[in-house]
Each structure stands twice: as C-alpha cells, then as structure tokens.
Design a protein with these regions (language model features):
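Extended amphipathic alpha-helical segments with heptad-repeat/coiled-coil character used for oligomerization
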Residues: 56-136
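Extended interaction regions within the primary functional domain
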Residues: 51, 58-70, 86-91, 174-195
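Core segments of small alpha/beta cavity-forming domains
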Residues: 1-78
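Generic structural hydrophobic/aromatic packing signal, biased to beta-strands
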Residues: 45, 100, 115, 143-145
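Extracytoplasmic/luminal low-complexity segments enriched in Pro/Gly and acidic/polar residues
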Residues: 118-220
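Residue-identity detector for threonine
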Residues: 12, 22, 43, 63, ...
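Phenylalanine-focused residue identity feature
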Residues: 11, 20, 45, 57, ...
Length: 220
C-alpha cells in the first residue's frame, strides 16, 4: 500500500501519486518477479526505467567482474536474482516490510521528485532436488527513485533508480550479480570470502552496508 499523495514542492499530488505507483511497480518487478528471481531476464524491471537508464541497465546486465570496492560490475545487482539452478522458492509467500515517502531534491543538476524507499524482502528457498536443504535469504533495498523528465522534456515524470541494497543468507563474492543461497549443507565448503566485521541484523531496516559488504549476520 502506497502512502496518500500530497503536493511536494513544485510537484502536484497527481505527480506524487503516479511516482508512488511506479515506485511500487519497480519494487515488485525488482524483488518479486518470479522470472527474474529465478535467474531469468529482468524484463519487467527494465521496461519501467527511463530509456537512458534502461540502455545502461541492459548493456551491463551480463558483465562479469568486480569494481575496486568488490561490488559486481553487472547491473543485475539492481534486482534480486538467484543464479540459474541455485534455488527454488518454498511456497508462495515472500514477506515484505518497508516504507516509502516523497520529497523534492536535487539530483544530477535537476530538481527531482525523490521517492525514498526502505524495504526488506524475505525469501524461503531450497536447493533444487534437495527440499530438506533450505534457508532464508533477506534482501534490503534502500535509497530513492528520482523522478524527472529525463528523456522526454515536457512529458511525464520518469524514474531514475538511485537505490542500493544488502543481502543476508547468500554467499559473498558474487562476480556476476547473481545471488547464491548459503545452504546449511554447503556453508563449510562454500567458495568466496568469509563474512567478517560487526554483526548485522538482516531484519532491521537500518542495516545498510552496501552491495560489496560481506558482513556477519545475527540470523536469517
């Protein structure tokens, strides 16, 4: 459920309402779309972006490697997507908790309608072919969708995705943007960095370490 829309700065209540609805669609397409979740193309998410960002998103979707801070270069990190063949959803319920709000802000030299979001998505997943081997993965998306007339001056407001995220219950060290669940049977021999640093509560909306972080979690 999105908040009741009110005028914000120079933006009308109708523009705020439209931005809320588009932000909701982006959250759903990026975190609840079954095709993208199970490693397929995130088409629904890409179609909601403005044309400039869509081209960037699709152009780097299959890029492999990491940046200097260790975060994947692939734009697939902008959605929640398990590596093909690494997970099956347990049941039909994905738990969601979060908030969104609107404000006028400056972004890239432009006055934008910023829809701030802070959401947690909790998935129960099992190893394909081994239903007894299951775990939970928690995705945390935060930041803002910034609305302006990015590629169509005089047209409707369009979103620019300026959000980030954390994940718990997935292996660290992804080089392709996909998530790989940290199943109990594989934890001891799992590849990738070992979680370190302060413990993080994955169910807290305040936990925001960034996509390159490999923090220890209290539980999943």
């Amino acid at each position: 459920v999105v908040p009741a829309a009110k005028p914000v700065g120079s933006f009308t209540a109708a523009q705020v309402e439209a931005a809320y609805q588009t932000s909701r669609k982006l959250l759903v397409a990026g975190n609840l779309n079954k095709v993208a979740l199970l490693g397929g193309p995130p088409t629904a998410f890409a179609n909601l972006l403005n044309s400039q960002e869509r081209a960037q998103f699709l152009g780097s979707l299959n890029t492999k490697g990491v940046s200097k801070d260790g975060s994947p270069l692939s734009t697939r990190v902008e959605v929640t997507s398990f590596a093909p063949g690494s997970a099956e959803l347990v049941g039909n319920v994905i738990k969601v908790r979060g908030t969104m709000s609107a404000k006028s802000a400056a972004f890239a030299g432009t006055t934008v309608l910023a829809i701030s979001v802070n959401y947690l998505f909790a998935y129960a997943v099992e190893s394909p072919g081994s239903p007894a081997d299951w775990t939970r993965v928690v995705a945390h998306q935060y930041g803002s969708f910034d609305f302006a007339q990015w590629s169509d001056p005089g047209g409707p407001l369009q979103p620019w995705d300026d959000t980030g995220g954390d994940h718990a219950g997935a292996l660290c060290g992804s080089t392709d943007g996909y998530l790989r669940p940290d199943y109990p049977s594989e934890s001891a021999s799992a590849p990738g960095p070992t979680p370190s640093g302060p413990f993080m509560n994955p169910y807290s909306n305040a936990s925001a370490g960034g996509s390159a972080a490999c923090a220890q979690t209290t539980h999943v």
